[in-house]
């Protein structure tokens, strides 16, 4: 169920950019440069990705912290307080770690990765546009996530406005497999290595 103080989704400006996986970083940098962005949560599906994205944002000179299950309770509380007090501008979080976040003044929710559970999308974006304030929810969707996007639109009974790019018709088996691979919060390293080796071999054969 959605948190009691979550914003009704009709009041949130929702949009999606269709991008390749390797274009997401550049698009995120572009979004973070928006002068209207005062306080934002960037969502990822995995802890590893949250750390990577947080490092990228910090290198841009933007104060940020990662919030996920590998952080101690004390570290999570400290990050939340810093976010609430305006000491950090961006929080990079996984869905599980973000549960219970209740901070006013969040202007942007950025879905660096779309959730594979459509209800999580509603939970994510409901943290912006509170108390009549403006709020934007922007999603970056690569070909492997288009199924997730369709499920989300089915749930909210609405099409999300396309801000850039076009959906790919090439939702290949490998893309879908890649999307499923990301469902686990922290894929085991050896599985990930096997997965990469398998695709390198397939690419070599196809070349």
Descriptions of predicted regions:
Residues 1-171:
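Conserved helicase RecA-like core
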Residues 85, 153-207:
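Basic Arg/Gly/Lys-rich low-complexity intrinsically disordered segments
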């Amino acid at each position: 169920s959605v948190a009691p103080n979550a914003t009704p989704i009709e009041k949130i400006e929702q949009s999606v950019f269709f991008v390749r996986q390797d274009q997401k970083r550049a698009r995120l940098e572009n979004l973070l440069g928006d002068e209207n962005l005062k306080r934002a949560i960037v969502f990822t599906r995995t802890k590893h990705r949250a750390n990577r994205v947080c490092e990228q944002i910090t290198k841009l000179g933007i104060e940020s912290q990662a919030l996920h299950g590998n952080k101690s309770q004390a570290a999570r509380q400290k990050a939340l307080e810093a976010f609430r007090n305006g000491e950090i501008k961006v929080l990079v979080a996984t869905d599980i770690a973000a549960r219970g976040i209740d901070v006013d003044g969040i202007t942007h929710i950025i879905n660096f990765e779309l959730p594979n559970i459509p209800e999580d999308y509603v939970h994510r974006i409901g943290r912006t546009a509170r108390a009549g304030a403006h709020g934007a929810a922007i999603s970056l969707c690569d070909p492997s996530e288009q199924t997730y996007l369709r499920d989300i639109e089915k749930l909210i009974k609405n099409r999300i406005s396309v801000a850039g790019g076009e959906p790919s018709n090439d939702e290949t088996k490998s893309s879908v497999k890649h999307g499923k691979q990301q469902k686990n919060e922290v894929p085991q390293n050896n599985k990930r290595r096997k997965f990469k080796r398998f695709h390198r071999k397939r690419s070599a054969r196809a070349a």
